[in-house]
Amino acid sequence: MKKILGIVVVVALIGIGYQFQSSEEEEEFVPKPDSATLRKTTSGSLLGYTGANGAWVWRGIRYAKAPTGTLRWRAPLPAKAPRKGGIIETLVSGNACPQLPSALSEPADEDRVTIGEEDCLFMDIYAPPEAEKAPVMFWLHGGGNTIGQGSSYSGENLAMKHGVVVVTINYRLGIFGWFSHPSLTTGDPKDDSGNYGTLDAIQGLQWVQGNIENFGGDPNNVTVFGESAGGVDTLAMMASPLAEGLFHRAIVQ
């Protein structure tokens, strides 16, 4: 029985890996703005593109204000649409969060030890064309909460093969994501929690609740799923009162 179960698990993981492929497979594809993907959101009017397999894709969506300067080591604040208005092309994923180079990232420049930028709270969305009330799958990447980024994974196959809207996000990592010190105390429970990476994920879910219907997703049918550290972060979503009502199912690997 154990042997059979092991085979089933391996086959299942291989299948998931095929459906949720690495974005590296799309390097030769050059995205072009598609007017059919224009969507109005709380982050502004977003223009995406049609992916190689037909999925509609929006990359580099700012879901929270840049956690820099006075917002470093503070709870995330919602992103706002630019005052000047206009259309924001979302063809390229946003910055990775600061981290050491790894197998999950690009190499560092010769003059830098780390990669990424503090201005990194971005998400990518993948949806079947003309989707309506489709289930939403909200991905939390792994990497020990110190490395990785949401854009390392493309949700195009998952969206097209299973009729779901896939959301992947970046969240703060390492000392920027989980850190507390008496000198940072403000008296605000969220700001003083030290759990900034967790709060980023919750802010991402709040953005989904307010906007995903415009992408064909159902805000009342949201599944959070993650692997490794992303699985632990998924458990944190299940445990946090702040995430209550923001999602309805969870998958932990």
Report each predicted region and the residues it spans.
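Positively charged n-region of N-terminal signal peptides that target proteins for export
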Residues: 1-4
